[in-house]
């Protein structure tokens, strides 16, 4: 039976068009999904859009259109972005989908039946931009002495009737989860932040807003809409038709990884597992909280106004180049920088100069000297064996790197071997061997092609089009190059 693997992105909020930060997250998830498929897993990859809440309601009103018409338009932009980025998501969930609403009502009922929901009065600070409630000690002072959320967004005082969830009830269970599963939240720095937050004492949280029209209504009290985070987080099980008792839910849940931005770690690592504990469901295996993509050192966000249109970047650089830069230039999990100069220099150095140069020099000789067919190898000398050994080690190195989702390290190890192969090719000078030692020339070309084959297989999750084209040119007679299983078979020969 094939092992399953479930990966999700955070669903993108539809208060504006996609920016490069959204592209970064969905590309990263796609790379992981594609790698797992290469390794033989049955992968379910989910992304989608979060379409309810006061921000969306206000934006639609500002534009003079119906909220549903507005989110239909913006959601389509996110769907098209994923396609343009060559993403292989199995599903795209929308919180306005009927299937999602059914699951939200079901999880609310489970929480209520457990005695974990009660009606009370909420008095406190709320950020419309964050769609989040905050305690006063969490707020920061602005230059003019007004309060801001931890993300630097405006907050307002609200005093209204609200349904509450007994988050405080699950404090010990959450701390036990973090203690028993050290990799539940990665990177480790985020785990420490969350543990400190929970250890400081949890308060019950508001899970509804009153008199907000754009949301999923509480079934027993239509004056209330279900708070956007309980609504939004449920998407991960809605896509699997949890409330219908589906086979998909049995197969893929619990999720192997929720891939999210670091600014929403608390919602995923505290509130979501607490909701699941209450509902009697398993928690996800891991929350990977990646850093921000920075525009010249500044966080890219709609509120700051420094967003970058990813579609324009695709037109300027190409999809493989953008995917490669975003995932290789910065250790995954850390904040990363974007600029035109960085993308061009990075892509030129590694894709054009290293991989492109090696493949062009090798394949050109094969077509001119070997009638376009990869030659048979002769006896292998120490130089050949050393390079091949480094290449064959890549399979295990890649598995080790991707086990912790260190995508940059996985790519660096591949390009280290490509760099060695370029030096090998230059040192061996196969173009000088044609007349005096054609057997040796054939061996050098065979070894170089073997490096290109191995690295192209391993690069497929990131450089989707380019690596497949290279494999198609070099190995048109092979149909098994699409999986790592074929790589292993060749290594064991």
Residue ranges and their predicted role:
Residues 2-47, 99-103, 148-368, 410-414:
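Structured secondary-structure scaffolds
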Residues 369-373, 391-399:
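Long, amphipathic alpha-helical stalk/connector segments used for oligomerization, subunit docking
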Residues 428-438:
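Generic long, charged, amphipathic alpha-helical segments
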Residues 476-483:
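Conserved small/polar residues in nucleotide/adenosyl-binding loops
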Residues 487-493:
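Hydrophobic alpha-helical segments, chiefly the membrane-spanning helices
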């Amino acid at each position: 039976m094939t092992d399953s693997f479930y990966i999700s992105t955070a669903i993108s909020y539809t208060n504006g068009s996609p920016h490069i930060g959204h592209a970064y997250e969905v590309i990263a998830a796609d790379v992981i999904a594609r790698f797992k498929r290469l390794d033989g897993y049955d992968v379910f990859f989910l992304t989608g859009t979060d379409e309810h809440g006061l921000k969306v309601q206000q934006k639609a009103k500002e534009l003079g259109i119906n909220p549903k018409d507005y989110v239909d338009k913006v959601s389509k932009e996110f769907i098209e972005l994923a396609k343009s980025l060559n993403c292989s998501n199995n599903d795209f969930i929308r919180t306005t989908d009927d299937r999602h609403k059914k699951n939200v009502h079901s999880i609310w009922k489970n929480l209520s039946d457990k005695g974990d929901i009660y009606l009370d009065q909420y008095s406190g600070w709320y950020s419309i931009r964050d769609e989040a409630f905050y305690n006063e000690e969490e707020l920061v002072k602005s230059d003019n002495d007004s309060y801001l959320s931890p993300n630097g967004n405006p907050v307002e005082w609200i005093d209204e009737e609200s349904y509450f969830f007994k988050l405080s009830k699950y404090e010990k269970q959450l701390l036990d989860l973090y203690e028993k599963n050290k990799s539940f939240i990665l990177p480790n720095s985020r785990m420490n932040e969350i543990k400190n937050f929970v250890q400081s004492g949890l308060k019950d949280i508001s899970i509804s807003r009153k008199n907000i029209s754009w949301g999923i209504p509480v079934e027993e009290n239509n004056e209330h809409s279900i708070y956007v985070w309980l609504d939004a987080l449920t998407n991960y099980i809605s896509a699997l038709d949890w409330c219908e008792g589906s086979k998909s839910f049995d197969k893929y849940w619990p999720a192997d990884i929720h891939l999210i931005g670091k600014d929403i770690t608390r919602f995923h690592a505290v509130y979501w597992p607490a909701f699941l504990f209450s509902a009697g469901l398993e928690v996800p295996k891991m929350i990977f909280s990646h850093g921000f993509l920075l525009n010249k050192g500044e966080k890219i966000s709609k509120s700051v106004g420094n967003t970058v249109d990813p579609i324009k970047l695709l037109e300027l650089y190409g999809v493989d180049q953008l995917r490669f830069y975003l995932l290789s230039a910065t250790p995954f999990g850390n904040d990363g920088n974007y600029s035109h100069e960085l993308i061009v220099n990075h892509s030129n150095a590694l894709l054009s100069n290293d991989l492109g140069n090696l493949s062009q020099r090798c394949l050109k000789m094969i077509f001119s000297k070997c009638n376009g067919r990869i030659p048979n190898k002769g006896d292998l000398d120490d130089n050949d064996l050393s390079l091949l050994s480094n290449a064959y080690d890549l399979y295990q190195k890649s598995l080790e790197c991707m086990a912790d989702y260190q995508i940059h390290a996985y790519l660096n190890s591949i390009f280290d071997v490509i760099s060695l192969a370029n030096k090998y090719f230059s040192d061996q000078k196969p173009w000088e061997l044609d007349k005096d030692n054609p057997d040796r020339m054939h061996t050098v070309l065979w070894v170089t092609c073997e490096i290109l084959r191995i690295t192209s297989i391993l690069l497929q999750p990131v450089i989707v089009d380019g690596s497949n084209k290279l494999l198609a040119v070099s190995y048109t007679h092979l149909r098994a190059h699409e999986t790592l299983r074929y790589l292993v078979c060749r290594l064991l020969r």
